[in-house]
């Protein structure tokens, strides 16, 4: 009888120790309010470049801008997504991106491209002149500026 009780007790302990437990479900990540725009921006980047979902990326960028209207990278990427599909909207977003950081040469370059696509050559000449001053080592600025002067006559 003792042997049976001991065997039963050991079996219960063994089964209890190695029994399969239900996995814990991880809660959704909590994002601080100060990082909400950045979080939505990174979600948009993931959707655009990993999942190739440009519509979802655009929606994430727009939500990022709603969360933080001074977050320049979201304006920049939104303009980049729209540059060849909706040039007027891309120009508005590129102007916003440039206003958030007037020292960023990538924002300035995108603004110049958007101005060219919207046939605003005089504005593009001013933009590329400034870009030439900011990034004097970039030969493309000189080439585009020469083409713009040729276009204007």
Q: What are the language-model segments listed below?
A:
Residues 45-46, 80, 113, 147:
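Residue-level recognition of tetratricopeptide repeat
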Residues 18-77, 84, 92:
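N-terminal leader/linker segments that initiate helical-solenoid repeat arrays
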Residues 1-27:
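Bacterial Sec-dependent N-terminal signal peptides
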């Amino acid at each position: 009888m003792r042997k049976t009780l001991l065997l039963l007790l050991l079996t219960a302990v063994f089964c209890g120790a190695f029994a399969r437990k239900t996995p814990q479900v991880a809660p959704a990540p909590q994002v601080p309010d100060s990082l909400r725009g950045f979080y939505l921006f990174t979600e948009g980047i993931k959707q655009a470049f990993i999942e190739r979902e440009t519509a979802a990326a655009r929606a994430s960028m727009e939500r990022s801008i709603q969360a933080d209207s001074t977050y320049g990278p979201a304006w920049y990427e939104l303009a980049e997504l729209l540059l060849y599909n909706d040039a007027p909207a891309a120009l508005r977003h590129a102007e916003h991106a440039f206003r958030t950081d007037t020292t960023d040469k990538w924002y300035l370059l995108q603004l110049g491209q958007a101005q060219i696509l919207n046939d605003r050559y005089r504005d593009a000449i001013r933009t590329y002149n400034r870009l030439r001053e900011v990034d004097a080592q970039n030969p493309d600025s000189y080439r585009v500026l020469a083409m713009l002067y040729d276009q204007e006559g």
